[in-house]
């Protein structure tokens, strides 16, 4: 048996209560959003921005003020700088499209790839997780433009710089033995790299 309220004003009270609760909920969400925005906003900006490793166009291996360059492994950076100097003598300018990345920035790139390709397996062809990416440790760099990648594909071993993945002509890592033995065979893509299986 249903209980009804026939008291005067009972139906108005029932109509006002949800309205008041909705208003309070909206005020609470607004307050939380404001506080969160003040605290988390700058952190997110840092993760998304240069502090996290994001890079704009035209960055070179000599741009020490950029964390994506400054946080590269010192041996990798030395090799890149020597290669860039020699390439410049031939009219080729080597740009850094991506270098060191914070774990947060790398994870963001990974999640974007999962969303773009609609699967973790397909995304893994292009973007590693923060736990496995050599960018996070500063041991990998993505270079450009295409003239630079072509130049490094011909001369990279002289500097111990090797293209690691066949599907990523821009991705280079330091391979110390390359100077004597040449670059090792490339993996088809990152899914075939044992380091990515951790």
Q: Which residues does each PLM region occupy?
A:
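N-terminal Sec-pathway targeting helices
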Residues: 2, 6-25
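Hydrophobic membrane-insertion alpha-helices, especially the h-region
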Residues: 19-38
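Cell-envelope/glycan interface and biosynthesis
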Residues: 38-198
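General helical secondary-structure elements
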Residues: 10-13, 34, 44
């Amino acid at each position: 048996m249903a209980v009804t309220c026939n008291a005067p004003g009972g139906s108005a009270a029932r109509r006002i209560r949800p309205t008041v609760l909705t208003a309070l909920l909206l005020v609470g969400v607004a307050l939380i959003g404001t506080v969160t925005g003040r605290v988390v906003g700058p952190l997110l900006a840092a993760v998304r921005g240069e502090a996290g490793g994001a890079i704009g166009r035209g960055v070179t291996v000599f741009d020490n003020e950029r964390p994506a360059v400054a946080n590269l492994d010192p041996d990798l950076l030395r090799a890149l700088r020597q290669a860039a100097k020699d390439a410049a003598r031939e009219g080729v300018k080597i740009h850094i499209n991506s270098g060191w990345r914070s774990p947060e920035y790398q994870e963001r790139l990974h999640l974007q790839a999962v969303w773009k390709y609609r699967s973790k397996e397909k995304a893994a062809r292009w973007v590693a997780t923060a736990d496995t990416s050599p960018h996070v440790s500063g041991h990998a760099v993505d270079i450009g433009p295409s003239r630079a990648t072509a130049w490094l594909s011909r001369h990279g071993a002289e500097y111990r710089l090797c293209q690691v993945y066949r599907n990523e002509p821009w991705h280079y890592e330091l391979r110390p033995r390359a100077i004597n033995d040449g670059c090792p065979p490339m993996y088809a893509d990152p899914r075939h790299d044992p380091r990515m299986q951790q």
